[in-house]
Regions:
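N-terminal helix-turn-helix
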Residues: 1-57, 221-226
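Sensor-regulatory modules in signal-transduction proteins
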Residues: 184-187
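Short clusters of small/polar residues that mark proteolytic maturation junctions
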Residues: 4, 90-92, 170, 195-196
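Amphipathic alpha-helical effector-binding/dimerization core
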Residues: 38-134
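Conserved GNAT-family N-acetyltransferase fold
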Residues: 26, 182, 194
Length: 237
């Protein structure tokens, strides 16, 4: 509300009333993750400017709530933003097992997280190669894997074979955390990832996959089915 008020020059009360009206009409919704206002798929009737991350977030939100009741651990929907995966929707706020709350909008490194490695594994070759080349040119330690093509290729091949990506204490910023992630696709093209985040000391990657991978894959397929039902297609650049 504050951002829109500042951008538009309207009073905050006016902005809130307008948003509430749009919510009543079904064009915006309140995110359960952070109480922000988000566009709904109904804006298709008004404009073609509804980006892929909006589609996947709007369609996935109710499914994530159901998934939380099943797996208990928090899950995120992420999409690519140039050089990182960005959390678009999450259940961290509602999971009793999460130490994180403000996750929407957080950037996750491609080479150090399950979501990032999953996206790279299932992305088109040309798109993946361009991004890896960009990351390899950066001197920071977090991009070292991009400068080790054989090692990276082996990790991505294993990810494709297993059907999921993994991170077990790989991200120094979140050393106590582990995660697994599966791709969400449209027209056989990855457009986002669904991950499950947990405390690494609670179980191994293999245990997490055995226990929770079927649920993640099922929900990913449900998101894809909803996108197809709504005739939401990822547009090739």
């Amino acid at each position: 509300v504050g951002t829109l008020a500042e951008f538009s020059g309207l009073h905050r009360t006016t902005v809130r009333r307008l948003l509430e009206t749009l919510q009543d009409e079904g064009y915006v919704r309140r995110s359960r993750s952070d109480d922000s206002f988000r566009l709904t798929i109904n804006v298709r009737q008004l404009s073609d400017g509804f980006r892929d991350e909006h589609w996947i977030s709007a369609l996935a939100t109710p499914l994530l709530g159901e998934l939380l009741r099943e797996v208990q651990w928090p899950t995120d929907i992420t999409t690519l933003d140039v050089d990182a995966m960005v959390v678009r929707e999450t259940t961290h706020r509602f999971s009793r097992l999460s130490f994180h709350r403000a996750m929407v909008g957080r950037r996750l490194p491609l080479l150090l997280t399950a979501s990032g490695l999953t996206w790279l594994a299932f992305a088109p070759d040309a798109e993946r190669d361009a991004i890896v080349s960009m990351l390899a040119a950066r001197p920071e330690a977090e991009y070292q894997l991009a400068r080790e093509p054989e090692r990276l290729a082996a990790i991505l091949a294993r990810t494709r074979q297993n059907g999921y990506g993994e991170n077990f204490r790989s991200w120094r910023q979140e050393e106590k955390i582990a995660s697994i992630a599966v791709p969400v696709c449209s027209q056989q093209r990855v457009i986002g990832c669904l991950n499950l985040v947990y405390i690494a000391s609670a179980m191994t990657i293999e245990q997490a996959a055995q226990k929770h991978l079927p649920a993640l894959q099922r929900v990913a397929r449900q998101i894809e089915a909803r996108m197809e039902e709504e005739e939401v297609w990822y547009e090739m650049p």
